[in-house]
């Protein structure tokens, strides 16, 4: 099968984890991507990760490099740069089960974060970059003695073009999504 379209894309990430206090972790992440000669309808990067009211599988491609707190599929570009700082705070780290029930609570942790980044076509300026602040609550359990299941619930506020307040959730490696009702989110944040 031949094609008249020929383009290349590359993406990469740099991650650094610094242990703080007992088991707290400060995480620094830089992510970048570039698509060379891609036609406009094949631009791979979008600024947002979640679409309100939609559930989908956990992203494992370019979507995983997107920012939280921004509308998904509003704008695409052929260049991407995102910096993330997370502080991972363990709230409970204790294996707890009940008698012989095959369900084990492993740990619970809180992750406040800040993200700064942009996608663009051609040239950009530092003033075009967007940022977001949010927090996630993570839970890990073991079911059936050997299946680890991670879940998370988060809230984030994006600032800049296409920024919005999002409440999102996920079961790691299975699915994730965002709440649809804007009034529920506003009431939860501002009351």
Model-derived features: positions:
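Outer-membrane beta-barrel "beta-signal"
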Residues: 134-135, 164-191
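Membrane-interface anchoring segments and C-terminal beta-barrel signals
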Residues: 127-150, 157-162
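C-terminal outer-membrane beta-barrel translocator/porin domains of Gram-negative envelope proteins
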Residues: 1-104, 120, 178-191
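Outer-membrane beta-barrel transmembrane domain signature
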Residues: 23, 109-112, 116-133, 142
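Membrane-embedded beta-strand positions of outer-membrane beta-barrel proteins
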Residues: 14, 28-32, 85, 110-114, ...
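Short beta-alpha connecting loops at secondary-structure transitions
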Residues: 66-68, 150-158, 165-167
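Flexible, surface-exposed loop regions and adjacent strand-edge segments
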Residues: 43-51, 128-130, 168-172
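Residue-level signature of outer-membrane beta-barrel architecture
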Residues: 16-18, 87-89, 139-141, 157, ...
